[in-house]
Each structure stands twice: as C-alpha cells, then as structure tokens.
C-alpha cells in the first residue's frame, strides 16, 4: 500500500524529495553534491523508487548570483528521466518564490513579478 497526500487537485506519494541539498549547503547540512550528474542520479533514483513530489525553489542555489540553479537541475533531471509519459504525468514539481539574494544577504521579494519569472 502506498500512502498518498492531496496537494490541491494533485494526489502524490506521502514521501517527496526535498532537492535543496543538491544545490546548497545550510547550517545543518554542510555538504553539497558537487557533481551535477550525481545530483541528477539522486533525483532519478527517487523517481524510480516511486516518489511523485519534487520540492525546489529559485533560491536553492550555491551562491547569491546563481538563483534558479535548483529549478534548472530538477527540470533537467525530470526531462532526462527515462519514464513513460503516463509516469511523468503523475509527478508534481513544487517550487517557491518571493525570496531573493544579494551578495551576503537574503531579502523578501513578494511581488507578482517574482512568480512570473
């Protein structure tokens, strides 16, 4: 039996993959996958194991001037995942916006344009 959760109109597995560590270190998480192919392999392994929710954000990036790094990585992994169109249709990629980074600083940017790209 697979546990699922509803996110809006979507039903996904109860366990998702938080992709932030694939792009940036934190105070609790000092490591980062330096190898892009290894990071993509992690995402592929999660999808192959049945994970249907990938969590990303434009602020998940190795540095202040590489915003969008994680979203690009997740998109590349999703596109290169060898799955059927039916399997791909079940995947939800959740992203967030509204936080921006300047050199050495994080700040809020809660304006509609930040969601439009």
Label for each model-derived stretch:
Residues 1-92:
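N-terminal binding-site loop/beta-alpha segment at the start of enzyme catalytic domains
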């Amino acid at each position: 039996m697979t546990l699922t959760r509803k996110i809006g109109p979507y039903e996904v597995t109860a366990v998702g993959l938080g992709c932030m560590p694939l792009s940036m270190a934190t105070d609790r998480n000092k490591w980062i996958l330096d190898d892009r192919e290894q990071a993509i392999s992690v995402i592929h392994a999660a999808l192959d194991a049945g994970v249907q929710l990938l969590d990303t954000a434009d602020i998940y990036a190795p540095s202040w001037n590489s915003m969008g790094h994680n979203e690009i990585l997740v998109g590349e992994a999703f596109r290169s995942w060898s799955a059927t169109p039916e399997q791909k249709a079940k995947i939800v990629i959740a992203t967030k916006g509204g936080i921006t980074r300047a050199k050495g600083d994080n700040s809020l940017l809660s304006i509609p344009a930040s969601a439009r790209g």
